[in-house]
A protein has these predicted regions:
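Active-site-adjacent structural elements in folded domains
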Residues: 238-244, 368-372, 392, 397
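N-terminal pre-Walker A segment at the start of P-loop NTPase domains
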Residues: 352-373
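Structured core elements
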Residues: 13-15, 80-82, 166-168, 257-259, ...
């Protein structure tokens, strides 16, 4: 990514309601329900990974513009979920999220700032120990919500401090699958993993395409009574299955950054270690891949990349959609982690039979679309109550209706015990209607009102 791609981005706050059905409390159903809900986010990432990766001289010089950032942030004592996306891809991402999370609310917000003027800032990348094609453990193999450990670590951050887990993503080029499939194919032909890796890709392709595996195996069986074909262990068979499963999924190039801000160096180091240790649950130590921290020497460069959401090739890794969904998904209804920024009230789609004429009451915004809400004149003859506590906009709402009536030439009667609303309404009266105004002022002792 380049500096130019860091600007012109939309920062979206995504919130979901906490709704737990009674039947979801049954333990046998909970695990299945967890996997189904996390699977929704896998579908979102799979769609993103299926987009053709940008390439060519323009992408190389100016940087790829198909970057997306998914972030879990502790800011102002709340754990919030953000998506940062270019305006070009915004509608596409919103549609994908709403398709899987119909009750999610996505709203534009200004960028957050977890840093304080005197805070201590630490950051680290999370990278693979082995090649990208080796898989890690995903939510399908975990008994609990894979993100509970991450959000629990974030919930321990004190008020006034902050932290962010940032995933900067872009679609991976399709050739990333090739190496993993070649490794799996070589092991299926009776070779050890170490032998396949030592042989190298070119030799392996030649070996597979010429079908020499079967010839060599038969020759060795004739030569030696017991044969010398290597027999795979059950765990090695699982490894082959994992390699093939990862290669069958949509792939995303990722930078995983963890940045913390605290009042003291000791607290900052503790916060960082707690978050990084939460990634151990995804490790498959011997027959798969592991995640490890990689703290750059130039912390200022990393923090700058974090702020501008830049992609750094030197710390990249390739995750399948399933692996990415295991590390980032919207909070589940069963999540009990404190400080989650839940959606407390949902927005509903306006009814399709909204009147197209009448006085304008306001605008209803739903999933990026604005709808005019109007009231017909016949309905206004009924009693209407405007209820709400001080400061929520009752007088402003009434003043808007009064202004529309005055501008339309209709008659208006306003009784205001305070007088502020009357003063505001008088400003709406045009010169040509000045003679239409009758003002009853109880404070005018020269013209007392008879009650």
């Amino acid at each position: 990514g380049s500096w130019s791609t860091s600007f012109g981005m939309s920062i979206l706050l995504v919130r979901v309601p906490k709704e737990l059905r009674k039947e979801d409390n049954v333990q046998d159903k909970t695990q299945q329900q967890i996997q189904e809900l996390i699977g929704r986010m896998e579908t979102v990432f799979a769609t993103m990974g299926s987009v053709k990766a940008e390439n060519g001289i323009v992408a190389w010089v100016l940087g790829r513009k198909d970057l997306m950032a998914f972030e879990i942030v502790v800011h102002k004592d709340k754990i919030s979920f953000y998506v940062t996306i270019s305006k070009k891809l915004r509608q596409f991402i919103e549609e994908q999220i709403h398709a899987q999370y119909p009750n999610a609310q996505i709203e534009d917000v200004s960028d957050y700032n977890i840093f304080a003027p005197t805070s201590v800032i630490l950051g680290s990348y999370v990278v693979f120990k082995r090649a990208d094609y080796f898989p890690i453990k995903t939510y399908r193999k975990l008994e609990t919500d894979s993100m509970n450990s991450l959000t629990n670590a974030l919930s321990k951050i004190d008020s006034g401090d902050g932290a962010s887990i940032q995933y900067v993503l872009r679609a991976a080029h399709k050739h990333w699958r090739r190496d993993g499939l070649m490794i799996a194919k070589g092991m299926q032909q009776g070779k050890r993993l170490s032998d396949v890796e030592r042989q190298g890709l070119l030799g392996l392709i030649w070996y597979v395409m010429r079908g020499l595996g079967a010839i060599i195996t038969e020759h060795n069986k004739d030569k030696t009574p017991g044969g010398n074909t290597y027999h795979l262990s059950p765990l090695e068979n699982d490894m082959i299955k994992g390699l093939e499963e990862k290669a069958s999924k949509a792939g995303l190039e990722a930078n995983i950054r963890v940045v913390v801000s605290a009042k003291t160096p000791e607290k900052a180091q503790r916060y960082l270690n707690d978050i990084l240790n939460s990634y151990c649950q995804f490790n498959i130590y011997e027959y798969g891949n592991s995640l490890t921290k990689k703290m750059p020497m130039l912390q200022t460069r990393m923090i700058r990349h974090f702020i501008f959401r830049r992609f750094d090739e030197s710390f990249s890794l390739i995750l399948s959609a399933e692996e990415m969904a295991s590390m980032f998904h919207l909070p589940l209804p069963s999540t009990e982690t404190p400080k989650i920024n839940w959606l407390l009230s949902r927005k509903a789609l306006p009814p399709p039979n909204l009147p197209s004429e009448g006085i304008l009451l306001g605008l209803s915004e739903y999933r990026g679309h604005k709808y005019e809400v109007r009231m017909k004149s016949g309905d206004r003859r009924r009693h209407m109550y405007v209820i709400g506590k001080s400061g929520v906009g009752k007088s402003v709402f009434q003043a808007s209706m009064i202004k529309q009536d005055i501008e339309a030439g209709r008659g208006v009667c306003v009784i205001d015990p305070h007088g502020d609303l009357i003063d505001e309404c008088l400003e709406y009266v045009p010169k040509e209607r000045a003679d239409d105004v009758i003002l009853f002022d109880p404070a005018d002792f020269e013209r007392p009102l008879g009650l």
